[in-house]
């Protein structure tokens, strides 16, 4: 139960910190943190939680990561369902808190997106469904490659949180214009439910693509690195 609670809290922090920075701070007049600031915020949530709860749950914070680690032989199948439930509930709870905070500001309109992920007319840069699919698969594949490598027993000790957090920052820098960056089905779900409509209709992609990418990343890592000692 402790690990499930840790995943709930960790995913809550990721959504509140990452999506919160996008909704509340990215475009703040004169002092907005902008595109790069949002990317950094997502990375910082992972770094901070990895040090805080990594020793409790492994700090997955992401159904695709849990599934990828299972595919890579690093996580038991029996733990997948409760981990994913905890992650999704944490993301939804964070979305609710963020909605309450954001709705207290002048001019807030959840229909503007609320940091939701999307493609076609709902892509920040107008990217197609195919472009969004490829982007999310490839970004999540490399995210799992970094996670698998950084947490390998053969890797330098103590640096995994930094490597993983920086990888997530880089992923956001690349893909925010394409999909608003998911690579995390829980993160996508936690805000899409409050937007409704198109955000929920397009949510399927942000479950399917990250999971495919995560499994590919784990399998590729096993192929090139072999078994950990």
Curated annotation (Swiss-Prot):
Site positions for Selectivity filter: 42, 172, 181, 187
tRNA processing keyword on record: no
Record motif NPA 2, residues: 184-186
UniProt keyword terms in alphabetical order: Cell inner membrane, Cell membrane, Membrane, Repeat, Transmembrane, Transmembrane helix, Transport
Catalysed reactions, semicolon-separated: H2O(in) = H2O(out)
Pfam (any one): MIP
GO MF, any single term: water channel activity
Domain-related comment: Aquaporins contain two tandem repeats each containing three membrane-spanning domains and a pore-forming loop with the signature motif Asn-Pro-Ala (NPA).
Protein name: Aquaporin Z
Gene: aqpZ
């Amino acid at each position: 139960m402790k690990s499930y609670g840790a995943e709930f809290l960790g995913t809550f922090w990721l959504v509140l910190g990452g999506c919160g920075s996008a909704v509340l701070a990215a475009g703040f007049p004169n002092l907005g943190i902008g595109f790069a600031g949002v990317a950094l915020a997502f990375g910082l949530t992972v770094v901070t939680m990895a040090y805080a709860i990594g020793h409790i749950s492994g700090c997955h914070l992401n159904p695709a990561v849990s599934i990828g680690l299972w595919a890579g032989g690093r996580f038991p199948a029996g733990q997948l369902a409760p981990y994913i439930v905890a992650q999704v509930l944490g993301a939804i709870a964070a979305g609710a808190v963020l909605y309450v905070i954001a709705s207290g500001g002048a001019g807030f309109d959840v229909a503007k997106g609320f940091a939701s992920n999307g493609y076609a007319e709902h892509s920040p840069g107008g990217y197609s469904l195919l472009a969004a699919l490829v982007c999310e698969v490839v970004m999540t594949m490399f995210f799992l490659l970094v996670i698998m490598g950084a947490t390998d027993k053969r890797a330098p000790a103590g640096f995994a949180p930094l490597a993983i957090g920086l990888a997530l920052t880089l992923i956001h820098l690349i893909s925010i214009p394409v999909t608003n960056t998911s690579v995390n089905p829980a993160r996508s779900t936690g805000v899409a439910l409050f937007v409704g409509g198109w955000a929920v209709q397009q949510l399927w992609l942000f479950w399917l693509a990250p999971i495919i990418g995560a499994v590919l990343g784990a399998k590729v890592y096993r192929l090139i690195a072999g078994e950990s000692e």
